[in-house]
Structures are given as C-alpha cells and as structure tokens.
Amino acid sequence: MAVIDKGFGAYDVRGIYPDEVNEELAYRVGRSFPTLFGAKKVAVGHDIRLSGPAIRDALTKGLTEAGCDVVDIGQCGTEMIYFATAHLGLGGGIMITASHNPKQYNGMKFVRAEARPISSDTGLKDIAAMVVGETYPAPAAVPGKIEKADVLDAYVKHILTYVDVSRLKPYKIVVNTGNGAAGPIINAMEKFLPFELVKVYNEPDGNFPNGVPNPILQENREATAKVVRETGADFGVAWDGDFDRCFLFDEKGDFIEGYYMVGFLSEAFLKKNKGASIIYDPRLIWNTIEIAEQLGGKPVMCKSGHAFIKDKMREVNAIYGGEMSAHHYFRDFSYCDSGQIPWLLVAELMSASGGKTLSELMKARMDRFPTSGEVNSTVSDAKAVMDRIEAKYGPSGKVTKVDGLSVEFDKWRFNLRMSNTEPVIRLNVETRQDKALLKEKTDELLAEIRA
C-alpha cells in the first residue's frame, strides 16, 4: 500500500481512500505521533465514513506499538475529540474525518494536549516527513493499551452549559444532520431541550444517500429550507459531516450568511460578559465591530484559519471567535470550534427577543451592512491581480494586509484573498446601508479582477 504525503495540507490530512489516505499511512501516523508530541495517551475517533473503522484500527495499532495508550471514543464529531482530549487530560487527539468532502475521501485532524491545534507549521510537516521517511523509533518494549470510552453524556452536559435551558422557548426547529455524525448527538440532546425537533436525514450513513453533507453548497440547502417552510418551523439548522460547522436558516427558509452569525453570537456573549474580547476575521468586519463596540466589547481582528484564531483567542483571552466560513470558537470549549453551541445560542437570543423571528433579528443587520457574499474568480496570475487591484484602490483608501488585501473607504470596503490551493481569488465587498453602491463596486472589482 503506497504512502505519499499528497494528503497533508495546512491543517489536516485529507485525500481519496485508499490511494492517498489508507491503513498504512494511518499506521505510520500512529507510530510517529507519540514521538513528535510526547503523548502518552491519545483520544481517537472517526466520523461516519465507511473507511473510518479500518483506518482507526491501523492508527491504533501504530499508536500502541509506539507505547502510547489509546482512548477510543468511537463514532463522533471532530469537536468530541477536542472535548475528550481536554476533558480527560490526554496528551493529544486524532479525529478520522474528511469533513465535508465527497464519500471517497477520508483523512485525519490532530490536536496536542489541551486540544491545541496541530497545523503545518506546528508539527504537521514533521508528521508527514516521519511518515513518508519511516524515521519513527523502533516499537516500544511495552505496548500501549486500548480502552473504549463513551464521552457523549459528558459532552452534551458541557454543551448545554452555554445557555440557560430554563429560558428557552418551545420552538419548532428543523435539524438536518445530512446523514453525518450529528444525528446521535441531536438525539442525546433532545430530552434536555423544550424544542420540537423536525429531523431530516438523521441516520448516520457513510454512503451519503442524500448527497455530501456540506450545506455551504447551494444545491444542498434546499432540503433544509423546504422542510422549514413546509412545517412552519421557527428556524432550521444543517451540519456538515463531522458537525464542526452549522448553518442557519430563518423561518422563511432563507439561508443566513456566516458573517451575520458572527455578529449575532458576539452579541450573545457580550450581553453576558461585559468588556470581553471577541475575534473576527478580516473578510467582512463592520457589522461585528459595531455590535461589539455597542455592547462594550473589544473586537480583535485575526487572520482566518483555525490555528490563527485559536492562538489569537488565547493571546487576548477572547471569549468567542467567529469566521464567516461558519467556524465558531469558544473559550470555554478549550478555544475550539463547535457546531452544536451556535444554534443553541441563537435559540436563546430569540427567546429573549420579545417574540421576534430570526428573520426580523437578522434583517436589521443585513440592511445596515449589505454584502456581496464571497465571489470566486479563476485567474492565471493571482499575485499580479492582487498587485494591480492594490495599485488602483490602495492610494485613496485605508489598506490592511492581515489576511490578503483589505481596502476601506467611508461608505464601502473590500477584501481580496488568494486561495492556498488553487488559482482562485476570493472577493468580499460590504457597504454602509447602500445596496446600489454594493452592486456597483462588486461589478467594478470583478471586471478589474477578470480583465
């Protein structure tokens, strides 16, 4: 079985099974991980992908041969590995998942002690080198032990601490787990909540009979939106396969962009934690900054990407961090991202709103700071395009380069970023209460980018 480093990315390992991610790769990762991170005991779990158990067995074999004990938490979501690693005081955690990729993929995400992220510049490249070169030490004299652990009840109990359950209204909520790993979690939480949950594709199934669980894709949204409209639900939630991201739909079935969720969740935390810091990414910013400042919070900008966000949150002791890509991070969840905490906070904010619908709560913000949404353009020379745009717009605006190129004017601003993996430039534009200006500037920039 060939072992190549093609699947090693900036934040995880991900590739087609068995060509790029396979049992031999997993075994070698297991042999390497304890040496590189000093881990004596590691949590291991897998999502619903069909190759998950085989990769888990090979990974576990490698870990135990390296003398490392394994806590096998079984089928789970990525955040449950974060939780188990921190909650049980382990030396690391490995989640077998390819998140929202098609079913032929699998992969691994890694954390060290305290559920701190491992990315390319904090150890992932070292894993790749040791795996491909087979430079890990000889097997330990005493192999590690394997124990099975069920962390579901402790995890659910922790998740529910983020809201006052007694104050939640009995909403009807559509929950679409996309045949991913979130189904059993929803079932376990249901008995503690006053909601009527309308379940869609709730059975975990690695064949993905209803499509890839990736609600960011336009074609996957209608399944949730349709049921919201048909059942008269108060709102809808959809998750990706390993449920580290959740996506919200209002009572009309309209998709709520992740940007506005960052502001909404900032509000949830700052109402309870006066003066706290919150983290936001540079793509779209004005709504989040205004909400934070109005509530006496400290908004702090950070480059997008989970390793950057988590490090910045620790640095400034931020209570919450959000990215418009629907990743939401929580200080009391070991600074990790969760796809289960956000929808509960939305229900809590709605419950305290005096009967307002989700669309009513969101509309004011969306009208105040309308956005283009992220628009992708394929270009032959991304760097040249970035330089050209900066030369044209930079001199008359305020330029920042925390993440890509941001240029700000009185009434509008934009952010332009290059993709790390493809010849694509991503554009986000926002204005102050001016949809006509938004269209004008978005069209103008796209013409310039694609010229």
Could you describe each region identified by the protein language model?
Residues L124-K157, T161, E251-M324, H328-F330:
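Proline/glycine-rich low-complexity loops and linkers
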Residues N273-A451:
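Phosphate-binding and adjacent anionic-ligand microenvironments
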Residues N106-T231:
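Gly/Ser/Thr-enriched, mixed-charge loops and adjacent short helices
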